[in-house]
């Protein structure tokens, strides 16, 4: 366990106290069929107890179908069959009203190089007309860029290597009754594309259904805020996660804890509503768990709160509102 993790909410409130008690793996072969919706109607591929360490072989967002730079996404991809998800993982003892804690222990690229893919897709992206934001402009040309991704970095060009900063673009629990496309984010998690859902951090997800039914996939090697053209550096990975279960800690939005900050994630359209949802949840969190007066938290976040833009291209946009741990704790002493 990392030094900070032993002092995390996961370690303090989790059934397994943030400690590993078993090891499991989901390989591409054992996964078999990948999923394109998050719901409780698929047979769990794995059943574990809180404290389980799980190694997962994720696919890229295109399930490996874009193989070369001459490929045309419009001819190869079948929307909405994008964003393949591993899982579901059934967590023993998880009940509605609990919270699932997922510590992201490690992520590594896998497969034959070049494993990284980004592209321009017709009528998709933050600065183009889409089916939802219809324009008269002609679509941009379809362009595919394949890049080598290793632990040294993302080899963008001969002279430029971007840092390898992997994170899980899509992770979530099953909604209570719906089965929702893996392309959409919401209260259960989903396709948030928030870069802070990264190695070394914990994401907290609401349990809406017995067993939680955890899904994950769509791992990114690098991404700027907003995922502007709609496609980050998509790559297949071996991702190692550790799960724990927090009883009777009911949350309504995904939350992230790092060594330095606490974050609430809100999803919605327009973008300002996603920000409102994130900040409101953070204020309620500060009030309930740390004893802040609600209006004092509102005042404080006005001065020092930070906002992280996850994606601005999905059916709903995702925003993360955060406060530094040091600031939050010092504010309690006034």
Residue positions per predicted region:
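N-terminal, Lys/Arg-enriched amphipathic/low-complexity engagement segments
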Residues: 18-77
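Short, structured beta-strand/loop micro-motifs enriched in basic residues and often containing a Trp
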Residues: 29-39, 79-86, 180-188, 282
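Short, well-ordered loop/turn sites that connect or cap secondary structure elements
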Residues: 48, 91-94, 197
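Short, Lys/Arg- and Gly-enriched loop/turn segments at beta-strand edges
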Residues: 61-72, 107-119, 211-221, 310-312
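Intrinsically disordered, low-complexity linker/loop segments enriched in Gly/Pro
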Residues: 106-199
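Conserved mixed alpha/beta catalytic, RNA-binding, or beta-rich assembly cores of soluble enzyme
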Residues: 164-272, 277
